[in-house]
């Protein structure tokens, strides 16, 4: 067992050895290193063929047409291209966008940018279980609403939004629907023939592919138009210029191929580990699971340990690689905005830890983690005067704290 134990799969995954092996064949002189846009010689043709194969592998996971896949540098760029691209192209029809308060920063900050450009954005509050209410969404829709952006699976709490129902609603109102599927692709089945979703952001490194590569699914029927955000040689049918990184694209394709093949196996494996971890900590006092437990991917468990400071718990769990909040926001010491949106108070939001596991996590590692968590929480609570007061039956909300 290698320490520290990696339990932060929602931040990134190790590259699957099968993926790494494939990628190496597309870089050096004895490999296929050509530019896929070089049309005049075999080096280019072979690289283009490799890209086409990967495009098909990615499309297959979504049951899409390969021509609907546009390569980007990752889900952040895909979110930017989808939201800015659609909002700008359709701005004559209206300048109102709807999203939720628990979206990834790549969606929220892109929407903030649109607001600076004169768009109006409605940020929906989720229910306390993290799910978006359809009636609230419908109530927010207006005649000038051009875009709705709701993520499939939340990166902090793992809840699965009902994008099928949301898609039906958007289509009936002729509103473009964008879904950030960085955390769901390869974990939950996505079928674009069934789902009325127009734009889907995808990432490779969340499903055992390389970092720095992603894609945007852009529906052809009914056709969705976007304004390009990256200008240049007109690559990717003009949606996204820039030389295609063949080795990364091949890696993403292989990762998606394996994900489709192993989806059920990976799912059951994660579920067994999640239940094992949950069973190991649920008898502890003052422990809360954040987010709906049923409508959720099994790869994620977000737990609040009351009366323990999240940062000090992270430090005490030095042999576990876990996070409080998401990797993208843990650089700031603010409590998680996702947990705040669920209605958790600052203290509880600050005392939460996200455990996320995956293909290479073992039962032995989970058992070790349980032991570490129990010891660390007990030790920190022993040092906490608040814990003593709680144990004495004092309602901490009624205490008048002296201000220094």
Curated annotation (Swiss-Prot):
Regarding protein family, the annotation reads:
Belongs to the class-V pyridoxal-phosphate-dependent aminotransferase family. NifS/IscS subfamily.
Enumerate the Gene Ontology biological process terms: [2Fe-2S] cluster assembly
Gene name tied to this protein: iscS
Give the residues the record marks as binding [2Fe-2S] cluster.
328
Q: How would you summarize the oligomeric state and partners of this protein?
A: Homodimer. Forms a heterotetramer with IscU, interacts with other sulfur acceptors.
The pathway that the record names for this protein is: Cofactor biosynthesis; iron-sulfur cluster biosynthesis
Recorded source organism is Vibrio vulnificus (strain CMCP6)
Active site (catalytic residues): 328 (cysteine persulfide intermediate)
Keyword check for Cell inner membrane = no
This chain's protein is named Cysteine desulfurase IscS
Q: What top-tier enzyme class does this entry carry?
A: transferase
**Which GO MF terms are attached to this record?**
2 iron, 2 sulfur cluster binding; cysteine desulfurase activity; metal ion binding; pyridoxal phosphate binding
Cofactor(s) named in the record:
pyridoxal 5'-phosphate
The modified positions for N6-(pyridoxal phosphate)lysine read: 206
Question: Which InterPro entries has this protein been placed in?
Answer: Aminotrans_V_dom (IPR000192), Aminotrans_V_PyrdxlP_BS (IPR020578), Cys_deSase_IscS (IPR010240), Cysteine_dSase (IPR016454), PyrdxlP-dep_Trfase (IPR015424), PyrdxlP-dep_Trfase_major (IPR015421), PyrdxlP-dep_Trfase_small (IPR015422)
Q: For this protein, what is the EC number?
A: 2.8.1.7
Concerning NCBIfam families, the annotation shows:
IscS, PRK02948.1, PRK14012.1
Record carries keyword Cytoplasm: yes
Q: Which Pfam families match?
A: Aminotran_5 (PF00266)
Residue positions annotated to bind pyridoxal 5'-phosphate are 75-76, 155, 183, 203-205, 243
Instruction: Give the UniProt subcellular location, in the record's own words.
Output: Cytoplasm
């Amino acid at each position: 067992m290698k320490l520290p134990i990696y339990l932060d799969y929602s931040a990134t995954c190790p590259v699957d050895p099968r993926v790494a092996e494939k990628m190496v064949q597309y870089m050096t002189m004895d490999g296929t290193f050509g530019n896929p846009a070089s049309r005049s010689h075999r080096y280019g043709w072979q690289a283009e063929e490799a890209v086409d194969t990967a495009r098909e592998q990615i499309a297959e996971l979504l049951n899409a047409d390969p021509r609907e896949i546009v390569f980007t540098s990752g889900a952040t760029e895909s979110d930017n291209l989808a939201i800015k691209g659609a909002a700008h192209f359709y701005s004559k029809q209206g300048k109102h966008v709807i999203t939720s308060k628990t979206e990834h920063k790549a969606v929220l900050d892109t929407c903030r940018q649109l607001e600076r450009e004169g768009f109006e954005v409605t940020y929906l509050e989720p229910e306390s279980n993290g799910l978006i209410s359809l009636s609230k969404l419908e109530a927010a829709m207006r005649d000038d609403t051009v875009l709705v952006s709701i993520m499939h699976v939340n990166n902090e709490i793992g809840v699965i939004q009902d994008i099928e129902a949301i898609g039906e609603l958007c289509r009936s109102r002729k509103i473009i629907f964008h879904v950030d599927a960085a955390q769901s692709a390869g974990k939950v089945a996505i079928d674009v023939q069934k789902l009325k979703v127009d734009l889907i952001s995808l990432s490779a490194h969340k499903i055992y592919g390389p970092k720095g590569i992603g894609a945007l699914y852009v529906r052809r029927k009914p056709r969705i138009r976007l304004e390009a955000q990256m200008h240049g040689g007109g690559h990717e049918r003009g949606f996204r210029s820039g030389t295609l990184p063949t080795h990364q694209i091949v890696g993403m394709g292989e990762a998606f191929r394996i994900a489709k093949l192993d989806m059920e196996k990976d799912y059951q494996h994660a579920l067994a580990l999640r239940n094992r971890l949950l069973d190991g900590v649920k008898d502890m006092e003052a422990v809360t699971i954040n987010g709906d437990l049923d409508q959720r991917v099994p790869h994620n468990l977000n737990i609040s340990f009351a009366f323990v400071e999240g940062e000090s718990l992270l430090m005490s769990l030095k042999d576990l690689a876990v996070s409080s909040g998401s990797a993208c926001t843990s650089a700031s010491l603010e409590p998680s905005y996702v947990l705040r949106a669920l209605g958790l108070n600052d203290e509880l939001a600050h005392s939460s830890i996200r455990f996320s596991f995956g293909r290479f996590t073992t039962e032995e590692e989970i058992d070790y983690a349980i032991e570490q968590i129990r010891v660390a929480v007990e030790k920190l609570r022993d040092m906490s005067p608040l814990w003593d007061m709680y144990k004495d039956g004092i309602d901490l909300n009624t205490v008048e704290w002296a201000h220094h």
